[in-house]
Amino acid sequence: GTKRVVVVGGGFGGASTAKYLRKLDPSISVTLVEPKTAFVTCPFSNAV
């Protein structure tokens, strides 16, 4: 049958997981669950 994966949370970890699951196996059905409609961040903004 079809492989189905649900990823809960669309932060860095969730979005990356969903992306790479699809890249590794395009036949996987990946659903990303995230309540927010936009993702805004400034990674490493506090790095000195």
Curated annotation (Swiss-Prot):
<dbReference type="InterPro" id="IPR036188">
    <property type="entry name" value="FAD/NAD-bd_sf"/>
</dbReference>
<keyword id="KW-0574">Periplasm</keyword>
<dbReference type="GO" id="GO:0042597">
    <property type="term" value="C:periplasmic space"/>
</dbReference>
<dbReference type="Pfam" id="PF07992">
    <property type="entry name" value="Pyr_redox_2"/>
</dbReference>
<dbReference type="GO" id="GO:0070225">
    <property type="term" value="F:sulfide dehydrogenase activity"/>
</dbReference>
<dbReference type="InterPro" id="IPR023753">
    <property type="entry name" value="FAD/NAD-binding_dom"/>
</dbReference>
<keyword id="KW-0285">Flavoprotein</keyword>
<protein>
    <recommendedName>
        <fullName>Sulfide dehydrogenase [flavocytochrome c] flavoprotein chain</fullName>
        <ecNumber>1.8.2.3</ecNumber>
    </recommendedName>
</protein>
<keyword id="KW-0274">FAD</keyword>
<feature type="binding site">
    <location>
        <begin position="40"/>
        <end position="46"/>
    </location>
    <ligand>
        <name>FAD</name>
    </ligand>
</feature>
<comment type="subunit">
    <text>Dimer of one cytochrome and one flavoprotein.</text>
</comment>
<keyword id="KW-0560">Oxidoreductase</keyword>
